[in-house]
Amino acid sequence: MLYTLTAFSDGGDIFNLFRYLTFRAGAAFFTALIFGFLFGRPLIDFLRRKQGKGQPIRDDGPATHFAKAGTPTMGGLLILSSLVVSTLLWARLDNPYVWIVLLVTVAFGLIGFADDYAKVKKQNTKGVSGRVRFVIGLVIAALAATAAAWSHPPDLTLQLAMPFFKDALVNLGWFFVPFAMVVIVGAANAVNLTDGLDGLAIMPVMIAGTTLGVIAYVVGNFNLTDYLGVHFVPGTGELLIFTSALVGGGLGFLWYNAPPAAVFMGDTGSLALGGALGAIAVCTKHEIVLAIVGGLFVTEALSVIIQVLYFKRTGRRVFLMAPIHHHFEKKGWAEPQIVIRFWIISLILALIGLSTLKLR
């Protein structure tokens, strides 16, 4: 929004700063961070008053989780509000990729909000039917994938970019749309499954968001793509504003979500942030790299899939409990130990993902 003020700039005033992407990215980060610090405590107090008993705790979960009873959920509202406000304030609103990612984030956030609301109201862990959430998510992802394909340059519209190879593209035809749908919905649900311990999901999301922000900046810069041998997608650099706001809002939330958490992210936050990561990957044509950068989320999701399929087939379990972070809890690992080690893994995977820009 503030970018429009550059029209009134003569090149020598403060409005000229708004032309620079890096300046606006930094401003978006601090705007979201300050927003989170200012409104975090009032929101938590409001949620505690409205929710009473807070988020229901699974009866079959680790015994240590019963001490968390009464903790309010829907903390993702803090991330979403700071993210949306900051992005609208600092991003160019004539950029289609900004709107695609922003609308996907809000739409999945609404799905998560409905699920959290149902859980709190019924005081059970069921919430909205998984099938209903999945179908609505597919519809949102289909619209986003189609919009992204429409916004891409003609030579990239239905292409899948391959990492580690210079300008390597695979033409998926119209299979690109269902593929992109799987990426967006899969990312949303994978982050949702990861959000099971205090601080576990938000830091890997911020790490992945930072990585995708760098990738978006590179992919949207012709000189950098020409040097690195990466496909050029004009306009994606503006997504750096979104990812900067995501990290700022995420840090503001982590201030209150750090163990012992004063508030849980809930599906409101996890589905929204996962959907955002998937949408950014689709817009930047880095869907495969997302699987590397978000390898922790992929592992969490696969642990659930493997557990369910193996149990249905044999009546036995591969893991003591799924998702896999609960398996380590059952083995006696302390919660902070699991969280920090998973953060380290996320950072390593992010560095590997970034290396794909150069290793070609």
Curated annotation (Swiss-Prot):
Entries under PROSITE patterns matching the protein: MRAY_1, MRAY_2
One Pfam family matching this protein: MraY_sig1
Pathway(s) it belongs to: Cell wall biogenesis; peptidoglycan biosynthesis
Protein name: Phospho-N-acetylmuramoyl-pentapeptide-transferase
CC annotations in GO: plasma membrane
GO biological process: cell division; cell wall organization; peptidoglycan biosynthetic process; regulation of cell shape
UniProt keyword list: Cell cycle, Cell division, Cell inner membrane, Cell membrane, Cell shape, Cell wall biogenesis/degradation, Magnesium, Membrane, Metal-binding, Peptidoglycan synthesis, Transferase, Transmembrane, Transmembrane helix
Function of the protein: Catalyzes the initial step of the lipid cycle reactions in the biosynthesis of the cell wall peptidoglycan: transfers peptidoglycan precursor phospho-MurNAc-pentapeptide from UDP-MurNAc-pentapeptide onto the lipid carrier undecaprenyl phosphate, yielding undecaprenyl-pyrophosphoryl-MurNAc-pentapeptide, known as lipid I.
NCBIfam families, A to Z: mraY (TIGR00445)
Source lineage: Bacteria, Pseudomonadati, Pseudomonadota, Alphaproteobacteria, Rhodobacterales
CDD domains: GT_MraY (cd06852)
EC number: 2.7.8.13
Tree of life domain: Bacteria
MF-aspect GO terms: metal ion binding; phospho-N-acetylmuramoyl-pentapeptide-transferase activity; UDP-N-acetylmuramoyl-L-alanyl-D-glutamyl-meso-2,6-diaminopimelyl-D-alanyl-D-alanine:undecaprenyl-phosphate transferase activity
Family matches, as InterPro entries: Glycosyl_transferase_4, PNAcMuramoyl-5peptid_Trfase, PNAcMuramoyl-5peptid_Trfase_CS
Organism annotation: Cereibacter sphaeroides (strain ATCC 17025 / ATH 2.4.3) (Rhodobacter sphaeroides)
Membrane topology note: Multi-pass membrane protein
Gene: mraY
